[in-house]
């Protein structure tokens, strides 16, 4: 059931429920409208990689308990099409099969909502969502029914055309503090047969034009740009993550970074998902002749990126059979090869929290266990980017915002 409601006041909490023809009522839901210009603060939860089979959704439970978050941004892999036997922590019955049509995807969405923490999070605050490769079948006609089911089961702005339901990139404006620009780097890629070709595009020409026009027209203090995949360059021990990220589209990244740098478009924070690890990175301008990047001063960075750890999907430790020795070696290698990284965590799961004011954004990284139900969480790190700086402050502060 989806209902579009007009005439709501900005920056206001509303409660809602649904009643069917037989008088049966749904659980009570709570939402919050976006603020009007002049709001002094916005807080966003950021998540991705929520596999019901790989662990418990304790992170969702902790988000649901918060009353200080304006919206949740889910950057894809909201659900998973298959059960990974190497991560089989729990499999609610009945045993699922891989969806291959719209009915199968509808069933998978219903299956996920058997989880009480997910239901609580969905009922406690508004969600801004985009799909990724496990939410649909990108190579099948009509995306295997995945796009249709995703739209039916989630609150997404209606498509610009009934003939293009796959178009879900959009802007959500939070007063005059930030423009949330949700991109889709999955379904509009323009591939090339030549690796590294300048003709390849991760956004596609139409979406790139939309994104750059939104950035140019924005008069908000910040732009928070959602990307399902990692934006930052990755070298060394984590380079294998780059196969489906912006690393595979270097010309696209250079084009966008050049647009930001040459146009004087400061104060952009990219949020990303998919890779399951936690990563905070400066974004060096890769173009020849650009200001050389300095990890000490942040010079040469055109913005910053935050990728919180997955809600539950397997991390580096799961992929190396829990070997802490290997995890430590990969961690050291990643940090040594990537001076732009301000924070790395390869094993923990949870969510990110962005605390946005006109002068700075503080990113908090919250972690919860996944192997059993738990009502605990811990603050694993905080980072700060100052207005006009375009790089993460170092050393990072280590106190939660209040």
Give the location of each predicted region.
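Metal-dependent phosphoester/phosphodiester hydrolase catalytic core
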Residues: 1-402
